[in-house]
Amino acid sequence: TRNRTLFPYTTLFRSQAWIAIGLFLGTVCNWLLISKRLRRYTIVAGNSMTLPEFLENRFHDKKKVLLSISSVVIIIFFLVYTASALASGGKLFHTIFGIDYHIALIIGAAVILTYTFMGGFLAVCTTDFVQGMLMLVGLLTVPIIAFALVSGKFAANIDHTQVAGGYDAYMNLFMNGGRPYKFVEILSQLAWGLGYCGMPHILIRFMAVKDEKELKKSSVIAISWCFLSLVAACFIGIVGRAYLVDNVLTGGQTESVFITMIERVFTKNIGIPFVGGLFLCGILAAIMSTADSQLLVCASSVSKDIYKSFIRKDADDKRIMKVTRITVIVVALIAIVIAWDPESSIMGLVSDAWAGLGSAFGPAIVLALFWKRANMPGTVVGIITGGLTVLIWDYIPLMGGKTLAVTTGIYSLLTGFILSLFVNVIVSLATKAPSAEIVAEFEKVDAYSE
């Protein structure tokens, strides 16, 4: 389970560390609480292949209301999510080679499309492992070398950059810009962890595992990988400011701090540019491993959940594959348009997409797996509430020309998740209870878990 492109988080320690903590806690909960039960329920609920299909089978939605709504939500937010990955690739090539951002964006998209076409889900899972290892080595090695180069001047360099509050405040987890963190700020950053239980491209891996025994081994590897990579990402943010003391990155440039560190360490300090190139491939690996999953999930929602379910019910595998490939191309093109602005914030795009998917599907999945009384009306309203809350919170100026996200300082995922969960429970209790057959399936999963 990769960390959904780490590089927006590898900026300044004081502004991102709580997000890293939230992501780690979310990863642990996802693997220990969600993975095994979702795998078992997937078998009971007709061996579902996608998240919308699982929800449809879980609640016996013969009219396919859940399927259609879930697919639309996935397509909307995955377009933004995919755009963030493509924007990362564009900025990577632009920074390293000086290539025009727009050309770099197109090149990166072409590479991702090529191997997604060639291997589909198998290629995605295989490349995930290789890319993940390369990225982890880079994340661990570069900040350690950079720290060794400035270790004797670390505190002095931090103070020299005139960071708010000085060195002591910069290194204090509870300080932000020279002032104490507000509780709502910490809570909002920790809330990133809630998103994991609603991420379709993560959950389908639990659903697709061949043997449940593999989940235990995989959970150890995934949690360990997550811990190491997030600690390294924060370390990059801490060391980066001291190491780049004569060229402190500000604004949107902070998203390229890792790239800049690699270039300087292996060209100016050590003089082994080849090794630096390998680690830059680690950044590209993170981008690729995120984008390919996003493209495939979005394409599956269109080809299987919409096309086969509503447009061509008798479609064979060959036709579905054709629709999938066409969808991948269309999604990539739209994502390129969204990411076309060189000044677009990768962190902003990731944040919006993560919040939308987490708010819409997180509560729905948790209740579907663990609450016997959950029903289809509650799940439908909950998904819509979560998705709309994020869109309204982040994009519609309601107070003095500002959005609620700006006015309150609260991350939309926290608000959307809570509202979606609350509405789901209330509507489920206020409407007809699940049928005896649905309850029997739930109890079958319970018995299987004992």
PLM segments and residue spans:
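Loop-to-transmembrane helix boundary motifs in multi-pass membrane proteins
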Residues: 58-68, 303-343
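Helix-loop-helix module between adjacent transmembrane segments
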Residues: 18-116, 191-193, 284-292, 324
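Terminal cytosolic tails of multi-pass membrane transporters
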Residues: 312, 398-450
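Loop-to-helix junctions at membrane interfaces in multi-pass transport proteins
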Residues: 10, 14-21, 56, 133-277, ...
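Short, small-residue-biased leader/transition segments that mark boundaries at the very start
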Residues: 1-7, 11-12
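Helix-loop junctions at the membrane interface of multi-pass solute transporters
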Residues: 8-10, 35-44, 57, 74, ...
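Transmembrane helix-loop junctions in multi-pass membrane proteins
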Residues: 8, 78-92, 116-122, 236-244, ...
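Central hydrophobic cores of alpha-helical transmembrane segments
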Residues: 378-389, 442
